[in-house]
Amino acid sequence: MNGSMGAAGGQVENERAAEVPVSTLEMRTLSPETFLYTEVARSHLGERAGRVIELLLNKGRLSVSELVHLAPELGSKSVRTVLVSLIQLRCVQYLEETTVSGRKITYYYFNEDGFQLMLYAGDIVAAVESQFEADDAKEIAAQIVQNVLALGSLTTKDYMQSLASDVSVNDVASMFVKLVELGFLVPLSNVHYMPLADLWDVLYKKEYNAIPKNSTLSDAKKRAETKAKTKVQFNTLLKNVEMSNVLMTDMQTSMRRVQDNLPLTFNFGRYMKHRRSRQLVQFARSRVGSVPAMIYKVALKITEQCARALSDPLCETGLMQELEEQLAIQEDMALDDEKLPGVTFNAVDISRNLPNNIDLRGTLTSMQRRSQERSTHQGQSHKRLKAEDGMAVAVNHLATVEEEAEGDELLHGSDDDMDMFFDEGDSDPKSVSLINGHLKLLSTGSVPFLIESRPGLFYVPYSKLMPILKEAVYDAIIASTLGPSAHRILRCVRDNSLVSEKVINNTALMREKDIRSVIATLVKYNAVDILEVPRTADRAASRAVFLFKINEKHAYDFMKQNLAWNIANSIHKTEILKEENFTLLSKAQRDDVKGREAELLLPSELNQLKMVNERELNGHARKIRLLSMWEVFKML
């Protein structure tokens, strides 16, 4: 897939000549995201594109003359050529402004959408393929999406003209319609090439200047009225295009098809909904089990297209700096979780969309039967164990971890809810009562995977789930990298909000020396913040008390930057590996060598080629794992 994305920069020269130096250590450590996107640009589009992206990231918006001034080795013609390809791939946005003298200047901005499409390119194709069952449909959909990703956008007319003679035109046209209806392909518009913050400013100035100069309104009321009107226009421009303007009916075949000359591009927001569903399914599997997670996966699949976006576009306009606007946006997003059309479902909807090979019989047990088994087990057990202090303890008094977990989980549900948990005598493998039982499990646990808005009607509360998911992923990373002790102290600080070292000593049940060492490590990685509280009026440092707290924003931002650096470093090492073995790789890719490597290559060359391929695959697998964690803190 990287090869097809590399071909995307049609006019970008992918040359190895070292006109522009490779990423320096200073740049890599100064800004991890700059390091990441620069490496992605270099690996896919070449050194010149990487240099332009690096300048746009470091300096902000720039004109062509400013880019040439900062990178004289590129030249004006080369800069313009690179910008055309970057704009085509949605890696750069632009805005034309008029100066006081009347001169028009075009400024170019960095746009991360294009680079995220490159990072997820392989998984995007797999995600689209998963929407279809037939192999022919999967192949056609994959080819369409690959071409859209490689070119940035395309029209159905241009794609049809490039088809081979043995490909059915009607099947391809029908697939375009399906991809548009699923939301993966959307019409390309000027909004894709314009920064949202600048779009907001343009609309705001237009509305504000439209207010009569002799208006008696106060400035505060003028701004409030302007803001309200701007929001309406802003949301109108960004809302989904009406299908009537995209799809048409072919008069000859009476089939629906996409308009021939309408350029289509990939909808990254729709794909991220799919990634969000995948994250939540994995989270549910770890908390409530594989069978409820399977039910949850079906529920997410039938509602994810209608579900709200990962973030509100208004968040990118600067309105989040105002507390009232921030709270209003959060309330609107929470309301959209329940009120948007198509986001609610019931057990019948799940039953209708379950795979045919699913059998839910035996996956739930009635509470009455479980209590009988437990009482029988307790009645039969009369053995006694001797504890360390010499006390004899009955075996049935030592509850297992599973029993304690079951008890804690059941505390969150009412008796009426528990009555649904039975399957004795139910012969239907997709029984609605069984599905309802699993939905109750998902909605009554400590983590609200679902919320029952009305009896039998459920929805997914993304606004409540995302913070819990972030916390769970963050804790898992801390526990796996810094150890269980760090995770224990982190939870201790979080549970007590603001805590002293003495409280940690009493609750963490660890040695004081170990606690101080672990706290120092957590502070180093921004997992815990230190707050100095003076105890005297003169604020003497010797009498101050140091308390510890968790600032989730700082902790998550640091983790996001850390993961971004690791992704970039993985790509950087892979590119260095390819450069060091450039001669061997070029030789192995020759047409007369392909398929005959064992005959034409030396044994040492074969071993080296095997090593390069293995390291490249390992780097790619590492990058995919890091991306799955990075997206939790970056986009979800």
From Swiss-Prot:
Keyword annotations of the record: DNA-directed RNA polymerase, Nucleus, Transcription, Zinc
GO biological process, one term: termination of RNA polymerase III transcription
InterPro entries recorded: POLR3C_WHD, RNA_pol_III_RPC82-rel_HTH, RNA_pol_III_Rpc82_C, RPC3, WH-like_DNA-bd_sf, WH_DNA-bd_sf
A GO-annotated cellular component: RNA polymerase III complex
Main location: nucleus
Taxonomic superkingdom: Eukaryota
A matching Pfam family: RNA_pol_Rpc82
Region: Leucine-zipper, residue numbers: 563-584
GO molecular function: DNA-directed RNA polymerase activity; single-stranded DNA binding
Region annotated Disordered, chain positions: 366-385
Compartmental location: Nucleus
Quaternary structure annotation from Swiss-Prot or TrEMBL: Component of the RNA polymerase III (Pol III) complex consisting of 17 subunits.
Purpose: DNA-dependent RNA polymerase catalyzes the transcription of DNA into RNA using the four ribonucleoside triphosphates as substrates. Specific core component of RNA polymerase III which synthesizes small RNAs, such as 5S rRNA and tRNAs.
Similarity comment: Belongs to the RNA polymerase beta chain family.
Record protein name field: DNA-directed RNA polymerase III subunit RPC3
Organism: Eremothecium gossypii (strain ATCC 10895 / CBS 109.51 / FGSC 9923 / NRRL Y-1056)
Gene name as annotated: RPC82
